[in-house]
Amino acid sequence: NKAYNDFEWHWYHFNGTDFDAKRNKSGIYLIQGDNKGWADNDLVDNENGNFDYLMYANLDYKHPEVIENIYEWADWFVETTGVQGFRMDAVKHIDSFFMRNFIRDVKEKQGQDFYVFGEFWNGNEEDNNTYLEKIEKRFDLVDVSLHNNLHNASTAGADYDLTTIFDHSLVKNHPEHAVTFVDNHDTQRGQALESTVEEWFKPAAYALILLRED
């Protein structure tokens, strides 16, 4: 409705959608055209082969007009709200080449103290290491592996070896780039990523993330 800028979204600003209005059918549809397609396999998470598409109308982060509008939105949002950082959601579904350059340019404009972290929901140690390399460690990541360890410890009880609680975690491998947490909105009961840390273990879990040396 052009309330904040004059940009108009058109079909070519997207690379996929989940509904064919002409045939009234739901599905995952790849939008075809010049320079269209999903992000390259090595730029998004490899779950399901290529996890560029998540839901609804999927932005094409290769399109120059999309890139320009996101940059303008970032400038407007920071200026309007005065925020001093971003939490980037679901970054494993976004072209990592775009993310690397976007955060680089945001920090060049806002200052290196502008804090950014991303929700890269992947508990695999190697995948996290690789992603940090791809984005040149320009922003931090939530420590999903540590959360999974906390969840497993809380459900296993006395059978869990606490000496392994930090194994394979970001906080062990890249402590300066790890954002630790116990639970969040995605891990609570009934959610797709349900992995709730049991209540009896939460005091110990918070002690582990808040009192750690690194």
Where are these regions (language model features)?
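Core domains of carbohydrate- and sulfate-ester-processing enzymes
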Residues: 2-52
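Active-site-proximal helices and loops of the catalytic beta/alpha 8
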Residues: 1-16, 20, 72-214
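Active-site-adjacent "subsite" loops/lids of carbohydrate-active enzymes
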Residues: 32-80, 91
